[in-house]
């Protein structure tokens, strides 16, 4: 029971630390959200630019969004490649932290399950030990 509570306490400390880490990463993501959205829009709407320039009707709105995205990226002063690498790294870190959070929560859940089932497990162990002693006595008598 003491070992179980120690494992649970460590898992809860780890979870709290991971939650703080995730909050920090989410704040960083939120600060750059406009740039990350512009990066995605510029990439996704590049074909709309070609269509607009070739005179295809109905491409005014996507082209305007494309131009807004390109303008935002040019004004930020960060190269697109650097911004893409930063975004990819941030999302990778978030995925890693989220995976660790799920693992810590699963560990806490297992501790809860073990604690809930402990009385029954202890009972089963006592029954098995008593049965083993009984078998041992019977074998001793037969000799």
Regions found by a protein language model. Name each.
Residues 1-143:
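Extended intrinsically disordered terminal tails
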